[in-house]
Amino acid sequence: MLKPLGDRVIISFVETEEKSVGGFVLAGASHDATKTAKVLAVGDGIRTLTGELVAPSVAEGDTVLVENGAGLEVKDGNEKVTVVRESDIVAVVK
């Protein structure tokens, strides 16, 4: 498993299917500004100018919304994952 550094987060995108009121399936990521992802690993955080460590706002296992197109796709064994900065994460889904 990869261990992200600093404020980086390793995620795996979740395929979602959206339906309109009429029951038609819409093309998921083609029109959305965000994508849903599962957090697989989180870095230790980022240091301020005074050296204090600011802990990340997300945790392993969280479901998050990420800006579409953000991050770097890498392979971890046979699995494709994406490394993003915490600032690319828009919200945590509760």
Curated annotation (Swiss-Prot):
SUPFAM superfamilies: GroES-like. GO terms for cellular component: cytoplasm. Coiled coil: none annotated. Keywords: Chaperone, Cytoplasm. Pfam families: Cpn10. GO terms for biological process: chaperone cofactor-dependent protein refolding. InterPro entries: Chaperonin_GroES, Chaperonin_GroES_sf, Chaprnonin_Cpn10_CS, GroES-like_sf. SMART domains: Cpn10 (SM00883). Signal peptide: none annotated. Together with the chaperonin GroEL, plays an essential role in assisting protein folding. The GroEL-GroES system forms a nano-cage that allows encapsulation of the non-native substrate proteins and provides a physical environment optimized to promote and accelerate protein folding. GroES binds to the apical surface of the GroEL ring, thereby capping the opening of the GroEL channel. Belongs to the GroES chaperonin family. NCBIfam families: PRK00364.1-4. This is Co-chaperonin GroES. The gene is groES.
